Swiss-Prot record:
Function: Ligand for members of the frizzled family of seven transmembrane receptors. Plays an important role in the embryonic development of the urogenital tract and the lung. Required for normal mesenchyme to epithelium transition during embryonic kidney development. Required for the formation of early epithelial renal vesicles during kidney development. Required for normal formation of the Mullerian duct in females, and normal levels of oocytes in the ovaries. Required for normal down-regulation of 3 beta-hydroxysteroid dehydrogenase in the ovary.
One cellular-component annotation, GO: extracellular space
Highest taxon of source: Eukaryota
InterPro entries according to UniProt: Wnt, Wnt4, Wnt_C, Wnt_CS
Organs and tissues of expression: In adults in lung and brain.
Family: Belongs to the Wnt family.
Protein name: Protein Wnt-4
Designated gene of the protein: Wnt4
UniProt source species: Mus musculus (Mouse)
Pfam families in the record: wnt
Outcome of gene disruption: Mutant embryos show normal early stages of kidney development, but later stages of kidney development are disrupted. Mutant embryos develop to term, but the pups die within 24 hours after birth, probably due to the absence of functional kidneys. Reproductive organs in newborn males appear normal. External genitalia from newborn females appear normal, but they lack a Mullerian duct and their gonads and sex ducts appear masculinized. Their ovaries contain less than 10% of the normal number of oocytes, and these are in the process of degenerating.
GO molecular function annotations of the record: frizzled binding; receptor ligand activity; signaling receptor binding; transcription corepressor activity
Primary localisation category: secreted
Keywords for this protein: Developmental protein, Disulfide bond, Extracellular matrix, Glycoprotein, Lipoprotein, Secreted, Signal, Wnt signaling pathway
Annotated glycosylation sites: 88, 297
Length: 351
């Protein structure tokens, strides 16, 4: 092997280790709770944190259970959004939780980083508004009368605090000495895109006040969107993600579209560095489970269809008996009574 090839292999290995470490904090999702943390020494025992995250944990003990919930939200949403794809966000009981999938510069890794940073920002913001955290509360910068004539009141979600904490905790590995590497630039961009998915979908919720339900006075507050909406938005960004490459721009390195004919990506778009594998065959070492045994849709021409999901291997068809409620009747007052019925359905699974 030539010296240049050796150097390239070493760089790829460093990037892989670097990227795996950056996402290891997602292992917190495997814990039932970290709310019982009451001593700084406990932070040292939390699996998956790098040293600077351990230091943040010690300074922010009360916030760590929100970080855990954010990690759980991210994994659950990833599995929902990718439920019909060849790679369906399957997790492992080891580090990193998504296997080596997140160590590659693919669009799947881009989504994982985006939804993870969004999960932390979302969970910490909601914890602020619900009064769980002493360090933050409602957003008091929103007040007075709006141009639309309603009164800002109630508890507006403190998204600024949630985003700031996510930036400090999630981005800490990339902002270290390797922050100029291609993967660090990619991860930082996608982390920020995840948080922007919340910011751009913030909504206004209102309550009317008046006699007999009239709306003589309307008070409103800003609220984060449902996390499912954030997931949908980021899944759309995944579908339209931009393949990029590092390039020297002035005195710094930046990511630019690999295809010069494509328009530049925005801060809200997802970016990736390399094509994805096909995820067809099981590769336990990489954390890829393959698609054998997966349920597929015989009539669909999309990615959930048997032809694509099964990677051309064909599929098995079996008659499966499903139990379901039927003949439901409302009884006064007040309950619904149903019978249990059996129904035969065809189930298709990949060979």
């Amino acid at each position: 092997m030539s010296p240049r090839s050796c150097l390239r292999s070493l760089r790829l290995l460093v990037f892989a280790v670097f990227s795996a470490a950056a996402s290891n904090w997602l292992y917190l999702a495997k814990l039932s709770s970290v709310g019982s943390i009451s001593e700084e020494e406990t932070c040292e025992k939390l699996k998956g944190l790098i040293q600077r995250q351990v230091q943040m944990c010690k300074r922010n003990l009360e916030v760590m259970d929100s970080v855990r919930r954010g990690a759980q939200l991210a994994i659950e949403e990833c599995q929902y959004q990718f439920r019909n794809r060849r790679w369906n966000c399957s997790t492992l009981d080891s580090l990193p939780v998504f296997g080596k999938v997140v160590t590659q510069g693919t669009r799947e890794a881009a989504f994982v980083y985006a939804i993870s940073s969004a999960g932390v920002a979302f969970a910490v913001t909601r914890a602020c508004s619900s009064g769980e955290l002493e360090k933050c509360g409602c957003d008091r910068t929103v007040h007075g009368v709006s141009p639309q004539g309603f009164q800002w009141s109630g508890c507006s979600d403190n998204i600024a605090y949630g985003v700031a904490f996510s930036q400090s905790f999630v981005d800490v590995r990339e902002r270290s000495k390797g922050a100029s590497s291609s993967r660090a630039l990619m991860n930082l961009h996608n982390n920020e895109a995840g948080r922007k998915a919340i910011l751009t979908h913030m909504r206004v919720e209102c309550k009317c006040h008046g006699v007999s339900g009239s709306c003589e006075v309307k008070t409103c507050w800003r609220a984060v969107p449902p996390f499912r909406q954030v997931g949908h938005a980021l899944k759309e960004k995944f579908d339209g993600a931009t393949e990029v490459e590092p390039r020297r721009v002035g005195s710094s390195r930046a990511l630019v579209p690999r295809n010069a004919q494509f328009k530049p990506h925005t801060d809200e778009d997802l970016v990736y560095l390399e094509p994805s594998p096909d995820f067809c065959e099981q590769d336990i070492r990489s954390g890829v489970l393959g698609t054998r045994g997966r349920t597929c849709n015989k009539t669909s021409k999309a990615i959930d269809g048997c032809e694509l999901l099964c990677c051309g291997r064909g599929f098995h068809t079996a008659q499966v008996e499903l139990a379901e409620r039927c003949g439901c009747r409302f009884h006064w007052c007040c309950f619904v009574k149903c019978r249990q019925c059996q129904r035969l359905v065809e189930m298709h699974t990949c060979r």
